[in-house]
Amino acid sequence: MNMPMPTREVLTKPYLDQKSGTAGLRKKVAVFQQPHYLENFLQSVFDCVPELRGKTLVLGGDGRYHNRAAIQTAIAMAAANGAQRVIVGQGGLLSTPAASHLIRKYHAAGGFIFTASHNPAGPDGDFGIKFNIANGGQASEGLTDRIYAHSKVLTRYHIIDGSYVDLDRRGLQLLGSLEIEIVDCVDEYAALMQQLFDFDLMREWFR
Protein backbone atom coordinates (compact mmCIF):
# COMPACT_ATOMS: atom_id res chain seq x y z
CA MET A 1 0.00 0.00 0.00
CA ASN A 2 1.40 3.38 -0.99
CA MET A 3 1.51 5.72 2.00
CA PRO A 4 0.38 9.35 1.67
CA MET A 5 3.23 11.85 1.60
CA PRO A 6 3.23 14.72 4.11
CA THR A 7 2.09 18.05 2.75
CA ARG A 8 3.44 21.41 3.76
CA GLU A 9 1.53 24.66 4.14
CA VAL A 10 3.69 27.51 2.90
CA LEU A 11 2.96 31.08 3.98
CA THR A 12 3.02 33.53 1.10
CA LYS A 13 2.09 37.04 0.10
CA PRO A 14 -0.25 37.77 -2.80
CA TYR A 15 0.82 39.06 -6.17
CA LEU A 16 -1.58 41.61 -7.62
CA ASP A 17 -0.92 40.95 -11.31
CA GLN A 18 -2.30 37.43 -11.78
CA LYS A 19 -5.31 38.32 -13.91
CA SER A 20 -5.86 35.87 -16.74
CA GLY A 21 -6.91 36.95 -20.20
CA THR A 22 -8.66 34.81 -22.79
CA ALA A 23 -5.35 33.02 -23.41
CA GLY A 24 -4.57 32.52 -19.73
CA LEU A 25 -1.90 34.18 -17.61
CA ARG A 26 1.14 35.24 -19.65
CA LYS A 27 4.23 36.89 -18.23
CA LYS A 28 7.98 36.93 -18.69
CA VAL A 29 9.75 33.78 -17.51
CA ALA A 30 11.48 35.86 -14.84
CA VAL A 31 8.07 36.80 -13.41
CA PHE A 32 7.01 33.15 -13.11
CA GLN A 33 10.35 32.36 -11.48
CA GLN A 34 9.70 34.79 -8.62
CA PRO A 35 9.32 33.02 -5.26
CA HIS A 36 5.83 31.52 -4.87
CA TYR A 37 4.49 33.15 -8.07
CA LEU A 38 3.36 30.02 -9.88
CA GLU A 39 2.38 28.33 -6.63
CA ASN A 40 0.11 31.25 -5.72
CA PHE A 41 -1.73 31.05 -9.03
CA LEU A 42 -2.11 27.28 -8.86
CA GLN A 43 -3.41 27.42 -5.29
CA SER A 44 -5.92 30.08 -6.29
CA VAL A 45 -7.29 27.68 -8.89
CA PHE A 46 -7.42 24.75 -6.46
CA ASP A 47 -9.23 26.93 -3.92
CA CYS A 48 -11.74 28.27 -6.46
CA VAL A 49 -12.39 24.92 -8.16
CA PRO A 50 -12.96 22.53 -5.21
CA GLU A 51 -14.23 19.81 -7.55
CA LEU A 52 -10.57 19.12 -8.46
CA ARG A 53 -10.21 17.34 -5.10
CA GLY A 54 -10.57 13.59 -5.53
CA LYS A 55 -10.70 13.88 -9.32
CA THR A 56 -8.45 13.67 -12.39
CA LEU A 57 -6.38 16.59 -13.68
CA VAL A 58 -4.61 16.91 -17.06
CA LEU A 59 -1.19 18.60 -17.29
CA GLY A 60 1.10 19.54 -20.15
CA GLY A 61 2.58 22.38 -22.13
CA ASP A 62 4.27 23.54 -25.30
CA GLY A 63 7.76 22.57 -24.17
CA ARG A 64 9.16 26.06 -23.84
CA TYR A 65 11.70 27.08 -21.22
CA HIS A 66 10.44 26.49 -17.64
CA ASN A 67 7.79 23.97 -18.81
CA ARG A 68 9.18 20.94 -16.99
CA ALA A 69 9.80 22.79 -13.73
CA ALA A 70 6.28 24.21 -13.79
CA ILE A 71 4.76 20.77 -14.36
CA GLN A 72 6.71 19.28 -11.45
CA THR A 73 5.36 22.07 -9.24
CA ALA A 74 1.81 21.50 -10.47
CA ILE A 75 2.04 17.76 -9.76
CA ALA A 76 3.36 18.37 -6.23
CA MET A 77 0.54 20.81 -5.56
CA ALA A 78 -2.11 18.55 -7.10
CA ALA A 79 -1.02 15.83 -4.69
CA ALA A 80 -1.11 18.22 -1.73
CA ASN A 81 -4.55 19.52 -2.70
CA GLY A 82 -6.17 16.10 -2.88
CA ALA A 83 -6.30 15.29 -6.59
CA GLN A 84 -6.69 11.57 -7.20
CA ARG A 85 -4.97 11.28 -10.58
CA VAL A 86 -3.06 13.39 -13.07
CA ILE A 87 -2.63 12.67 -16.77
CA VAL A 88 0.59 14.20 -18.15
CA GLY A 89 1.85 14.37 -21.71
CA GLN A 90 5.15 12.52 -22.17
CA GLY A 91 8.06 14.91 -21.78
CA GLY A 92 5.60 17.45 -20.39
CA LEU A 93 4.34 18.10 -23.92
CA LEU A 94 0.68 18.68 -24.68
CA SER A 95 -0.93 20.95 -27.25
CA THR A 96 -4.09 22.81 -26.29
CA PRO A 97 -6.33 20.67 -28.57
CA ALA A 98 -4.72 17.48 -27.24
CA ALA A 99 -5.21 18.63 -23.64
CA SER A 100 -8.86 19.41 -24.36
CA HIS A 101 -9.29 15.92 -25.82
CA LEU A 102 -7.64 14.22 -22.83
CA ILE A 103 -9.78 16.17 -20.36
CA ARG A 104 -12.91 14.83 -22.05
CA LYS A 105 -11.57 11.32 -22.66
CA TYR A 106 -10.49 10.74 -19.06
CA HIS A 107 -13.47 12.64 -17.57
CA ALA A 108 -11.05 15.00 -15.84
CA ALA A 109 -12.27 17.86 -13.68
CA GLY A 110 -9.94 20.22 -15.55
CA GLY A 111 -6.42 20.78 -16.76
CA PHE A 112 -3.46 23.13 -16.61
CA ILE A 113 -1.85 23.96 -19.96
CA PHE A 114 1.52 25.71 -19.84
CA THR A 115 1.80 27.74 -23.01
CA ALA A 116 2.36 31.25 -24.27
CA SER A 117 1.35 30.34 -27.82
CA HIS A 118 3.36 32.25 -30.46
CA ASN A 119 5.08 34.52 -27.92
CA PRO A 120 8.90 34.29 -27.84
CA ALA A 121 10.27 31.52 -25.63
CA GLY A 122 13.57 31.03 -23.80
CA PRO A 123 14.95 32.33 -20.49
CA ASP A 124 14.30 35.93 -21.56
CA GLY A 125 11.01 35.13 -23.26
CA ASP A 126 7.46 34.52 -22.13
CA PHE A 127 5.71 31.78 -20.20
CA GLY A 128 2.04 31.14 -19.63
CA ILE A 129 -0.56 29.00 -17.93
CA LYS A 130 -4.26 28.53 -18.53
CA PHE A 131 -6.88 26.43 -16.80
CA ASN A 132 -9.38 24.47 -18.87
CA ILE A 133 -12.58 23.19 -17.30
CA ALA A 134 -14.21 19.74 -17.37
CA ASN A 135 -15.67 20.14 -20.87
CA GLY A 136 -12.17 20.75 -22.24
CA GLY A 137 -12.85 24.41 -22.94
CA GLN A 138 -11.31 27.50 -21.42
CA ALA A 139 -12.46 28.77 -18.05
CA SER A 140 -15.32 31.24 -18.09
CA GLU A 141 -14.71 34.91 -17.41
CA GLY A 142 -16.63 34.55 -14.17
CA LEU A 143 -14.31 31.80 -12.98
CA THR A 144 -11.13 33.61 -14.00
CA ASP A 145 -12.40 36.72 -12.19
CA ARG A 146 -12.93 34.66 -9.01
CA ILE A 147 -9.46 33.15 -9.33
CA TYR A 148 -7.94 36.61 -9.77
CA ALA A 149 -9.83 38.02 -6.78
CA HIS A 150 -8.68 35.10 -4.65
CA SER A 151 -5.06 35.48 -5.78
CA LYS A 152 -5.04 39.01 -4.37
CA VAL A 153 -5.80 37.82 -0.84
CA LEU A 154 -4.02 34.44 -0.82
CA THR A 155 -1.83 33.87 2.24
CA ARG A 156 -0.78 30.20 1.94
CA TYR A 157 -0.47 27.28 -0.45
CA HIS A 158 -0.11 23.52 -0.07
CA ILE A 159 2.66 21.44 -1.64
CA ILE A 160 4.54 18.17 -1.24
CA ASP A 161 8.26 18.73 -0.77
CA GLY A 162 10.95 16.75 -2.54
CA SER A 163 8.68 15.16 -5.11
CA TYR A 164 9.95 14.19 -8.54
CA VAL A 165 8.15 12.52 -11.44
CA ASP A 166 9.90 11.07 -14.49
CA LEU A 167 8.05 12.92 -17.24
CA ASP A 168 9.72 10.87 -19.97
CA ARG A 169 8.67 7.41 -18.78
CA ARG A 170 5.29 6.36 -20.06
CA GLY A 171 3.00 4.52 -17.70
CA LEU A 172 1.84 4.79 -14.12
CA GLN A 173 3.82 6.39 -11.28
CA LEU A 174 2.77 7.15 -7.72
CA LEU A 175 3.34 10.19 -5.55
CA GLY A 176 1.85 9.33 -2.20
CA SER A 177 -1.77 8.52 -2.98
CA LEU A 178 -1.69 10.46 -6.27
CA GLU A 179 -1.66 8.39 -9.46
CA ILE A 180 0.37 9.93 -12.29
CA GLU A 181 -0.07 8.53 -15.78
CA ILE A 182 2.38 9.64 -18.46
CA VAL A 183 0.77 9.27 -21.90
CA ASP A 184 1.94 9.66 -25.48
CA CYS A 185 -0.03 12.73 -26.48
CA VAL A 186 0.72 12.20 -30.20
CA ASP A 187 -0.80 8.70 -30.14
CA GLU A 188 -3.78 9.96 -28.14
CA TYR A 189 -4.49 12.83 -30.54
CA ALA A 190 -3.85 10.72 -33.64
CA ALA A 191 -6.44 8.22 -32.41
CA LEU A 192 -8.95 11.07 -32.06
CA MET A 193 -8.21 12.28 -35.60
CA GLN A 194 -8.76 8.76 -36.94
CA GLN A 195 -12.19 8.78 -35.34
CA LEU A 196 -13.05 12.12 -36.92
CA PHE A 197 -11.64 11.63 -40.42
CA ASP A 198 -11.62 8.77 -42.93
CA PHE A 199 -7.92 8.79 -43.76
CA ASP A 200 -8.24 5.84 -46.15
CA LEU A 201 -10.77 7.78 -48.20
CA MET A 202 -8.62 10.92 -48.07
CA ARG A 203 -5.64 8.89 -49.25
CA GLU A 204 -7.64 7.80 -52.29
CA TRP A 205 -8.36 11.44 -53.16
CA PHE A 206 -4.66 12.18 -53.49
CA ARG A 207 -3.82 9.23 -55.70
PLM ranges: what are they?
Residues 1-42:
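Positively charged, low-complexity intrinsically disordered leader regions
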Residues 41-57, 196-206:
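Glycine-rich phosphate/diphosphate-binding loops that line cofactor/substrate pockets in enzymes
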Residues 44-48, 77, 102, 150, ...:
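Generic, well-ordered alpha-helical scaffold segments in large soluble proteins
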Residues 52-138:
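Ferredoxin-reductase
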